[in-house]
Regions:
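N-terminal leader/targeting segments and the immediate start of mature chains
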Residues: 2, 15-68, 74, 78-79, ...
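Sec-dependent N-terminal signal peptides
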Residues: 4-12
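Beta-turn initiation residues at beta-strand->coil junctions
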Residues: 62-64, 84-85, 99-102, 177-180
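An acidic-aromatic
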Residues: 70-119, 185
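Short, surface-exposed charged micro-motifs
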Residues: 70-72, 86-88, 134, 161-165, ...
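Flexible, surface-exposed loop/linker segments and immediately adjacent secondary-structure boundaries
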Residues: 111-142
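Gly/Pro-enriched, hydrophobic low-complexity segments
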Residues: 140-205
């Protein structure tokens, strides 16, 4: 979460936007009984949908406190290219290169393959089955389901607790909310489509 927040705050300092209230969670079903089986089925539907696309692109909006930033990423296999504000991230599946175009700096880091943080490892941002998260259905109503994901004991994930809202008709994610030590980051998914062009390659020349 620290990496996600530091990147957000860096970008937000460059281009702050007037705050807009975060999207509310979908109201829970009347009985509000956790249903792990249904939650797992929804998670499977979402991850299967992304796998069926093969290479794909996602556009999104991030909200943290009074800041709002839009971004996008493209995935092909374990490789991805992500843009958020003036920053770009290139990843070859093993190493990620964070490029701050304004400061003309490049930070090189090893990929955290176990991360489910959309800004840290977008390849697996919606791949929760078999991960170190316990899933429960927080509510389902009018074609929207809310799945709560809690780190299992021993999971030191940087994403903390996660709330995933899903359009159950299309089995597509609508939003993610990360909650780590009281800090919240809301990510709204604006669009998902098959990738039409090759991933942008890193050039340091």
């Amino acid at each position: 979460m620290k990496r996600l927040l530091s990147l957000l705050l860096l970008l937000s300092a460059m281009q702050s936007v007037a705050a807009v209230p975060a999207a509310a969670d979908v109201p829970a079903a009347a009985n509000n009984v956790p249903a792990a089986g249904r939650a797992d089925a929804i998670l499977a539907g979402v991850s299967d949908g992304f796998r069926a696309l093969g290479a794909y692109g996602v556009s999104f909006e991030v909200r943290s406190d009074e800041y709002v930033t839009r971004g996008r990423y493209a995935v092909e296999g374990e490789n991805y290219y992500l843009v958020l504000g003036d920053a770009e991230v290139y990843c070859d599946g093993a190493v990620r290169y964070e490029v701050d175009n304004r400061r003309r700096e490049v930070t090189i880091d090893v990929v955290d393959t176990g991360s489910r943080n959309i800004l840290n490892n977008p390849v697996h941002a919606f791949d929760f089955l078999g991960s170190e998260y316990a899933a429960s259905l927080a509510g389902e109503q009018e074609g929207r389901a809310v799945v709560r994901l809690t780190p299992a004991p021993g999971n030191t994930s940087s994403a903390g607790n996660i709330v995933l809202t899903v359009d159950t008709a299309a089995m597509r994610p609508v939003s993610l909310r990360y909650d780590y030590d009281g800090e919240q980051v809301q990510v709204s998914v604006l669009g998902i489509k098959p990738l039409e062009t090759p991933l942008k390659a890193l050039s340091l020349i």
